[in-house]
Amino acid sequence: MAVFLLKRGVWASLMIGGFGPRAVLFSKLGQNHARLSQATPEKLETSNEEEGSSSAQITAGVESDAENQRAELSEETVEVVFLDRSGQRIPVKGKVGESVLCLAHRYNIELEGACESSLACSTCHVYVNTEYFHKLPEPDEREDDMLDMAPLLQENSRLGCQIILTKQLNGAEFTLPKITRNFYVDGHVPKPH
């Protein structure tokens, strides 16, 4: 069970499907639209806060994005190569529909992904080889905003969480930058996803 406190300007939906219920937050402007189906929250409470703003609390079972993505993966595979920070080439096989970030985690490649694919950091920043860079869809405004915060930004920079493997990416190379930027509280040790 997970509890989310929602402020004004944001609404939530509980989705049924895949591995089970999933709570999803959507902005009022609809930036994160898609996949609305059979929304039935287990518990919804509203209250007024100071200054007239309202909040809602939803309690629901939540599945991780990684679990949800596994349900949507194709059996078709593509071969790609990661170049780690030391320059070592790491050839891997990924499933069509899998993100580059999830693929890196599956093979224990040090691509952090601190925000768990929520477009709130740039720790999964990668360089895409130019032959394949133009085969990717254009980044949306939110990805561009996060890339602006990435150190060592290049023309071929993308976020690994936003690159979804397709058959056209067979043979692509993803190079990890020498550094990434993340903010931690003293003593924090990142956990693998």
UniProtKB/Swiss-Prot annotation:
Keywords: 2Fe-2S, Electron transport, Iron, Iron-sulfur, Metal-binding, Mitochondrion, Transit peptide, Transport. It comes from the Eukaryota. [2Fe-2S] cluster binds at C115, C121, C124, C161. Residues 78-180 form the 2Fe-2S ferredoxin-type domain. The keyword Transcription regulation does not apply. Binds 1 [2Fe-2S] cluster. Residues 38-70 are annotated as: Disordered. Its cofactor is [2Fe-2S] cluster. One of its GO terms (molecular function) is 2 iron, 2 sulfur cluster binding. Pfam families: Fer2 (PF00111). It is found in: Mitochondrion; Mitochondrion matrix. GO terms for cellular component: mitochondrial matrix; mitochondrion. InterPro entries: 2Fe-2S_ferredoxin-like_sf, 2Fe-2S_ferredoxin-type, Adrenodoxin-like, Adrenodoxin_Fe-S_BS, Beta-grasp_dom_sf. Its main location: mitochondrion. GO terms for biological process: [2Fe-2S] cluster assembly; [4Fe-4S] cluster assembly; electron transport chain; P450-containing electron transport chain; ubiquinone biosynthetic process. Belongs to the adrenodoxin/putidaredoxin family. Component of the mitochondrial core iron-sulfur cluster (ISC) complex composed of NFS1, LYRM4, NDUFAB1, ISCU, FXN, and FDX2; this complex is a heterohexamer containing two copies of each monomer. Electron donor, of the core iron-sulfur cluster (ISC) assembly complex, that acts to reduce the persulfide into sulfide during [2Fe-2S] clusters assembly on the scaffolding protein ISCU. The core iron-sulfur cluster (ISC) assembly complex is involved in the de novo synthesis of a [2Fe-2S] cluster, the first step of the mitochondrial iron-sulfur protein biogenesis. This process is initiated by the cysteine desulfurase complex (NFS1:LYRM4:NDUFAB1) that produces persulfide which is delivered on the scaffold protein ISCU in a FXN-dependent manner. This is Ferredoxin-2, mitochondrial. It comes from Xenopus laevis (African clawed frog). The lineage of its organism: Eukaryota, Metazoa, Chordata, Craniata, Vertebrata. The gene is fdx2.
